[in-house]
Amino acid sequence: MPKLKTRKAAAKRYKRTGTSNFLRRHAFKGHLLMKKSNKQKRKLSQTICVSRSDIKSIKLMLPY
């Protein structure tokens, strides 16, 4: 059986936790930040868990 390939784009975006969840960063934090408040930018800097409906597809993209 051949080796499974990891989707490198997904590997850069998601990090697996110990309880088989995945962490991700918020969107809207890359550019156009002058119009956003400091509170909004601070909230967007935090990492959050991926929703349950997306975990199955991410596990297929990241087999290891």
Swiss-Prot record:
Organism taxonomic ancestry: Eukaryota, Sar, Stramenopiles, Ochrophyta, Bacillariophyta
Protein's recorded name: Large ribosomal subunit protein bL35c
Protein family (similarity comment): Belongs to the bacterial ribosomal protein bL35 family.
Subcellular localization, as worded in the UniProt entry: Plastid, Chloroplast
Species of origin: Phaeodactylum tricornutum (strain CCAP 1055/1)
Keyword Ribosomal protein carried by entry: yes
Keywords for the protein's UniProt record, in alphabetical order: Chloroplast, Plastid, Ribonucleoprotein, Ribosomal protein
Matches recorded under SUPFAM superfamilies: L35p-like
Protein's UniProt keywords contain Plastid: yes
GO cellular component: chloroplast; large ribosomal subunit
Gene Ontology biological-process annotations: translation
Source organism, top-level taxon: Eukaryota
GO molecular function, one term: structural constituent of ribosome
Pfam families reported for this sequence: Ribosomal_L35p (PF01632)
Database matches in PANTHER family: 54S RIBOSOMAL PROTEIN BL35M, LARGE RIBOSOMAL SUBUNIT PROTEIN BL35M
